[in-house]
A protein has these predicted regions:
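C-terminal non-catalytic regions of proteins with extracellular/luminal or membrane-system context
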Residues: 1-292
């Protein structure tokens, strides 16, 4: 069933050592570098704000307050959520937009699913574009999408949630060190994967199904961002597979064949562009596996 805790003896609580922390310049630092930077926004009708999170081998983010390094003065409560400095930068762009009637576009330059519910709810933010880590050459593609020279067709490969720290995988995550390990052991840490396969969309979609079916205590308040009964719409900002385009499409499933001898499933789908802009669409097929 969903919810509950388990104690693992001889494992110490994780720390922020070995994890990334986000560091964005404050308004004071930007003013010191260029006192007129806000005024320059009035000269353009499109403001691009980049929210970045670094990535690297053997390093990641620990969601929630535990992942914030207090020595860094980051002005935030979650490394995967917005900092106060990032909010201030977005607010400055929105204010400039009011003066020149332009657009505010937020670029998500990251390798981790960040918490962007407040941006989705912000009427002053006109669009968000997930660009990942494109590198120097990849930014040519970003420019093509922003200018309309290319029509985006990508879809999220992860679930963007309201609070990452509420997921079981985040609760179990950390550089947990054994207190009774042999001193000769080179790697003295343990990652508890009590959540099994239920990470990302596998957790959110399965718990949603259990909520609908009324089983497994799925509606329990454990893991809820609101402190009330767990509700999918309160937890998920953008689901796995979400994506937009400058045009519209319809999809029709014409044929579905299951070959148990070859262990294959073949689908025939007709995709029709019903808009005025050339583009591509993604056909997504989902299967629900039994609990066996």
């Amino acid at each position: 069933s969903w919810g509950g805790t388990k104690t693992y003896y001889r494992i110490v609580a994780p720390t922020t050592n070995g994890y990334f922390t986000s560091k964005e310049p404050s308004q004071a630092a930007m003013n010191a570098a260029d006192s007129g930077w806000k005024d320059s926004m009035n000269d353009y009708n499109v403001m691009l704000v980049t929210i970045a999170r670094a990535a690297g081998e053997n390093r990641s983010y620990m969601p929630g307050k535990a992942g914030v390094d207090p020595s860094q003065n980051l002005n935030q409560t979650d490394p995967l959520g917005l900092s106060d400095d990032e909010r201030a930068l977005i607010d400055a762009a929105v204010e400039a937009k009011k003066a020149n009637g332009g657009k505010v576009i937020v670029l998500l330059n990251n390798a981790s699913a960040t918490e962007v519910q407040e941006l989705k709810d912000n009427d002053g933010v006109d669009a968000m574009l997930e660009i990942g880590l494109p590198g120097g050459y990849g930014f040519y593609g970003v420019a093509d999408v922003l200018s309309g020279a290319a029509n985006p067709s990508g879809h999220l490969a992860d679930t963007y949630v309201v609070t990452n720290a509420n997921a079981p995988s985040a609760q179990n995550y950390g550089d947990n060190e054994w207190t009774n390990a042999n001193s000769d052991i080179n790697m003295n840490s343990e990652l508890v994967e009590a959540e099994n396969i239920y990470i990302g969309y596998k957790y959110y979609e399965t718990r949603y199904a259990d909520t609908v079916l009324g089983q497994g205590n799925a509606s329990d308040s454990v893991g809820s961002s609101t402190g009330k009964a767990w509700n999918y719409d309160d937890e998920v900002t953008y689901p796995f597979g979400y994506g937009l385009s400058y045009t519209t499409f319809t999809q029709m499933l014409d044929e579905l064949n299951v070959d148990t001898n070859q262990n294959t499933v073949t689908a025939k789908v007709t995709v029709t562009n019903t808009g005025d802009v050339a583009g591509k669409d993604v056909v997504q097929l989902y299967a629900s596996a039994p609990y066996t």
